[in-house]
Amino acid sequence: KPQTTRHKIVGIDSREKSQAVFVDTPGMHKKEVRAINKMMNKAASSALRDVNLVLFVLDADKWTQNDELVLEKLKNAEMPVILVINKIDTLENKNHALPLIQERAKLMNFAEIVPVSALRGANLDHLRNTIEKYLPFQPPLYSLEQITDRSERFLASEVIREKIMRQLGEELPYDLTVQIESFKTEEATINEKTGRPKPACTYIDATIFVYRSGQKAIVIGEKGAKLKKIGMDARVDMEKMFEQKIMLTLWVKVKGGWSDDERALKSLGYSDI
């Protein structure tokens, strides 16, 4: 969904002969009204100073004011910019793909233009090969097994937030955040009474903060149905991610004004760097 990334997140793609480190930034916000918007803009802008290559990702089916804002920033970039046109498979007429690419090519002097479908995995290998051409020759920055620089607590909060977005659609685009209150792992042991192995298990307690009580009711749903579904889906994904049993407990609390309070933002794990 658009405008859902709030943190600068590093993803690591290690291949046989290369390692690409992706910095997924929050989108730019034209109206810097709330503190969270200002922090997100700073995070996006600061990333441009530290990278060797920029991927400018656009949807094939639309052009937004925020796209225009990012484009103006990129025109002054000192590094190559690759235009990635996503959702190319959504075009009703496939003959419109080439004219679209030609039209987008006029936006600025792109180093490359690569159409893809992230959902279907179409042309992603070509994109990876294209990126590889622009990587500097140097030793890997991360171990080959590492896929991100973020903690397990952060990844857990992002999984929960993603499931909330999927359940609620556009009802709560910015007015919620997730805080991991407790993250404890019990290693695998042997049950003293039965002698049977007890698998490792991670116990996660998380709070979903919303602005208003009406939003709390939306997240919980009738008889708790939505919150239960969010928890179940998040637990399934976490068990795949962490490769162990997960016990997840969710609460929903009202915390008005959190997105315009810098102290509250920092206490919830937000940063402008």
Model-assigned labels for residue ranges:
Residues 12-16, 28, 47-54, 61, ...:
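Conserved, well-folded catalytic cores of nucleic-acid-processing
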Residues 1-13, 23-26, 243:
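Short beta-strand-centered segment that lines the nucleotide-binding/catalytic pocket of NTP-utilizing
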Residues 5, 29-30, 63-64, 91-92, ...:
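Catalytic P-loop NTPase motifs of RecA-like helicase/translocase cores
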Residues 79-82, 89-154:
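Canonical P-loop GTPase G-domain recognition
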Residues 13-20, 38-113, 184-199:
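Conserved C-terminal guanine-recognition region of P-loop GTPase G domains, centered on the G4
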Residues 28-37, 89:
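Flexible beta-alpha connector loops of hexameric P-loop NTPases
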Residues 9, 24, 44, 55, ...:
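Residue-level signature of catalytic and energy-coupling elements of molecular machines
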Residues 152-273:
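P-loop NTP-binding site
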